[in-house]
Amino acid sequence: MDSSNSHSYAVKGDKRLQLEQDVDLRDHSTMRVGGPAKWFAEANSAADVECAYAWAAERGIPVYTIGSGSNVIWSDTGYAGLVLKNIIRGFQILSEQDGQVAIRIGAGEILDEVVARTTRIGLTGMECLSLIPGTCGGSVYQNSGGYGQEVSQVLQSVDAFDTISCKVVVLETEACNLGYRSSRFKNEEPGRYVVLGLTVKLQTGPANRTTYPALLAMLGDRSRCSSADLRAAVISIRESKLPDPALVPNCGSFFTNPILRARDVNVALRLSLIHI
């Protein structure tokens, strides 16, 4: 954090968390917009998260938790509360058995960096998530996906801080209610849980055969390819569509495909023909 800002500390038991005041939120959004946060802190652990929420609750201050800020557009007036940035790290292989590898990942890990790491060691299951901006915690919140893969397909469980009970809980995949770009954390109980970490299960060996025309065109007629090859193809396509948020402010692709009831399909098709 910027040491030039005035600061104080949140204290809970023997835990001491540094709090910054009047932090420019443009530095915490890939859109590079927004005013100041009245309070700002970075959480490196579950204890940090608990400390921050306890401090805020004692003072009646709202808390907004973020990852890398790729799914938020701040108001020009800023945020009149505590912005808590989740930077919890960790990448631990828990088990390897019968071609399946379970990995626990900290919520603050950058998603693309984790995907790169898993493909380097020959694992498959997340390579199509390459270059999606944000953290692994955010990917659970959003059920990030693309080119035939979603976080829900590899997720085993989520460790989270429950802001109501003030306890750390473990939620199995089914309890997360992951859907198309949706989850329990985003849609049903927004703000209740802070994702601390997640456990995923990946596979060894070649990547699954893709059916996406753009990827097939890049990969040729290979029936099987490595996860690294598929990652490279996905990156090439994404780079052709969107600029790097570090160079040009943007938040990636945030549009979702419409979900239609069966009776509405023919109407949609007739309307689409008008534009062909």
Q: What spans do the regions from the language model cover?
A:
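Serine residues within intrinsically disordered or low-complexity segments
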Residues: 3-4
